[in-house]
Amino acid sequence: MAGIYLFVVAAALAALGYGALTIKTIMAADAGTARMQEISGAVQEGASAFLNRQYKTIAVVGAVVFVILTALLGISVGFGFLIGAVCSGIAGYVGMYISVRANVRVAAGAQQGLARGLELAFQSGAVTGMLVAGLALLSVAFYYILLVGIGATGRALIDPLVALGFGASLISIFARLGGGIFTKGADVGADLVGKVEAGIPEDDPRNPAVIADNVGDNVGDCAGMAADLFETYAVTVVATMVLASIFFAGVPAMTSMMAYPLAIGGVCILASILGTKFVKLGPKNNIMGALYRGFLVSAGASFVGIILATAIVPGFGDIQGANGVLYSGFDLFLCAVIGLLVTGLLIWVTEYYTGTNFRPVRSVAKASTTGHGTNVIQGLAISMEATALPALIICAAIITTYQLSGLFGIAITVTSMLALAGMVVALDAYGPVTDNAGGIAEMANLPEDVRKTTDALDAVGNTTKAVTKGYAIGSAGLGALVLFAAYTEDLAFFKANVDAYPAFAGVDVNFSLSSPYVVVGLFIGGLLPYLFGSMGMTAVGRAAGSVVEEVRRQFREIPGIMEGTAKPEYGRCVDMLTKAAIKEMIIPSLLPVLAPIVLYFVILGIADKSAAFSALGAMLLGVIVTGLFVAISMTAGGGAWDNAKKYIEDGHYGGKGSEAHKAAVTGDTVGDPYKDTAGPAVNPMIKITNIVALLLLAVLAH
């Protein structure tokens, strides 16, 4: 296995090396005029100030958790938590660092034409993508190799890896929620006063919230998404390894089966690097086609890589599992291929619901012609409808892979889905860069043809941001299911080895709906995503309200802003939003951490351990089911509202300034926190609840 571990670490380092070289290429590009650099500098300053303050707050929470975990489970678990948290933080920070420097270079590149603008924008996204995949794989592989090297086996090997996933998750939920509150507080506030009240266009330098809006794009869509997918990747690989350690306990195949998800990650990272080389504009100037070509090459190369990984690691023949269960290497390979197919299908479905070429978005645009209310009604209808197809795809994947290889087959499917994370994050991080480039072009008064180029790049960026959210949610839902399987298998393992784990003596867990504790667990789990979403939406409403007041005050008290003779105080909005986002993110983020612990001890106090474990397991299922639907409906609905507004701005139903446009702006304002704050933050929330339950089992077993 030493050769496989070496390959996995080399592949992860190749991704980091690719990122470093690409950063060098981007930074060497022309950064435009002094005015463009001044605007970009303000965005850089705001983004750094926000992330520095956010990470300081997270560090305090992280330090407390580190001490508690180390005290309860030992230093290797505490160290695992630290590795997950630090690597997740680095992925988000470096991604943001490059995107706020690439924006001005994309705007300058757009002066040379569409091809140059696309090249720079995608390269900056690819840096974030490869960092996420490389760091996630490296952190899990490195720590696993280290633990094996010091002779850790059984729980001493598994618990530190679970803690690594928890560290990544904790950073992720803060990054997603804090970044989401900032970005949408700025966006909604800027739109309400700028577009609706003052009647000035988007990204107008006269709007005091315009810099905060551009900062928000980076901390939400770039740093937030990076931390989110880093965490999903790390958690899924860890959960798959946990299941491998249980399903192949005490048999020779255990080492190779624990290495298999790492090998899949390694080959798919190399496939993603290859895919980035194929993102080139063709003769038809089809930007989306160029991006999808890169994605398809990555998926095709991953398919070939998975064939090799399967042949070398488990082999295609029969594999002996624990308790005499037989697995087939070929069936596991099919499960991995299904993961690639599910990724493609989820991306296609999300584009259907959020793209301007399809019925859903056009129906919302048409509804805008009859007023604000009908726009909101149709948007809500689409948000609900958009949950059906992804759920059916996930159901089909679960049943097929379970028939092939049981729960371990499902885990391998999710692992191969996430192995494409590098390319998917690249598509996502492309979005905020092009959005910012458009803003810089507008504020620096660049010629109309440059603005047309940045608009074309940005329109595709809107679609890629929506599409990658669909992928992130689908993989998070399936990943959480793997964590739930790890919870039930852990329970069964502790119960079967009662001599070593006396705390589980007499525990009899079943998830029968005739048990009131199971029903209560389902209800409590089901309400968590709604409560969490409500907290996120309320926080954005409050933050946007304070931005509205501040922008109105500046229009009132600083004469000459509207004439363009006086400069607004941009820093005031950035500072206000930073404070608001950090204050508002703490309590919702602690909800999924504390809920499983509180529920377990409350039910334990009322009944017994069996009832408490049953209620806790049911709660995990409840969170997965409602969380998946809440997240899909919010992100797809918000994306449809946003693109319906863009569709009208392209000249349909009266174009900009028409009554339909005003109604569409209202819908977009409602959809903003839906798709960029509450919806995406439900992802890490689902997984944290599951990981805390796994760690609770480890503490009780300890």
Curated annotation (Swiss-Prot):
Positions of disulphide bridges: none
Site entry (Determinant of potassium independence), positions: K465
UniProt membrane topology term: Multi-pass membrane protein
Family of the protein in this entry: Belongs to the H(+)-translocating pyrophosphatase (TC 3.A.10) family. K(+)-insensitive subfamily.
Segments crossing the lipid bilayer: 3-23, 63-83, 130-150, 162-182, 234-254, 255-275, 294-314, 329-349, 379-399, 407-427, 466-486, 517-537, 586-606, 612-632
Name of the protein described by the UniProt record: K(+)-insensitive pyrophosphate-energized proton pump
Positions that bind Ca(2+): D642, D668, D672
Any matching Pfam family: H_PPase
Quaternary structure and interacting proteins, as annotated: Homodimer.
Site feature location: Important for ion transport: R176, D221, D228, D676, K687
Positions bound to Mg(2+) 2: N214, D217, D435
Keywords, comma-separated and alphabetical: Calcium, Cell inner membrane, Cell membrane, Hydrogen ion transport, Ion transport, Magnesium, Membrane, Metal-binding, Translocase, Transmembrane, Transmembrane helix, Transport
Described function: Proton pump that utilizes the energy of pyrophosphate hydrolysis as the driving force for proton movement across the membrane. Generates a proton motive force.
EC number of this enzyme: 7.1.3.1
Cofactor(s) needed by this chain: Mg(2+)
Any single Gene Ontology cellular-component annotation: plasma membrane
PANTHER family: K(+)-INSENSITIVE PYROPHOSPHATE-ENERGIZED PROTON PUMP (PTHR31998)
